[in-house]
């Protein structure tokens, strides 16, 4: 091989190996190295088409249905923002659907259905629960209640809250609860409390507590959340440390007079509640081993009666971060491709003539009187006008 071509070709091969090797490694961590099948699914609803990434553990099916968790993202994000929860829950045996909300990611609402802030999120999670409840790999109890958890971040958290409320309203008519547990990340009741403007019931902590239906519920409220969990009477502003569990909203939610963070409480309806308060900001919930551990611990407690269908792995043992690192390495390899690839392409007959030698400097003629006249006009004209 021509020595002039050898080095670019070598670097091209190295870059390709990095891309392929680390992409394979990232895919391995995403699927727990073949123990979980990951596929994109689509399903129609009355409002449009929802899509998500389905994480189906090996062996899950009609003969071995599993506790299920539907996770979703915040405003202007997509299902991939829930990779950490989806990977860790699925490798412990849960079926997981990482959902794109309406008009986000691969999901789309029918024309005229959304179009406003209160259009895309209030029912997205509950519509996904309707679909998942009908699937043979999703566990139900002897009475037909779904063993399904709902978890979302920010707007996804608000959607999870409304899903629980709507499920309890439907229970009054059907006698079936499809949602068994719910954990919200980075959301309080700021927006669900305004659902009255959208013709729905406004949901605050008291309404949530009254409609919990004995479910296991939790909240993850970062101590430095930029948007939510303000103290009573406080308004938004610069980032400040917050103690949500001390607010009247949290007390109503936990149904306790002096609750503590990270503590389980039994409720009069037979349910359980907890509020986690990690030392984080709002978006850190997406990329946190601490937040992920809280999620795993929550569902371990929520689904403890169905532990036989799950795999016991300590919540501190997480692999999702290795997937992120592998993807970053693959991205570096992708960037490395460009220089050797361009160098080799320039050797092709079609592009060889595009290479030029050193250009001679341009000869500039001496400025004439016209140049000075135009310069003077350009300076004076703005002042005159």
Give residue ranges: language-model regions.
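Core alpha-helical transmembrane segments of integral membrane proteins
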Residues: 317-385
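Soluble extramembrane regions of membrane proteins in the secretory/endomembrane system
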Residues: 30-319
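An N-terminal hydrophobic leader/cap segment in hydrolases
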Residues: 2-44, 51-53
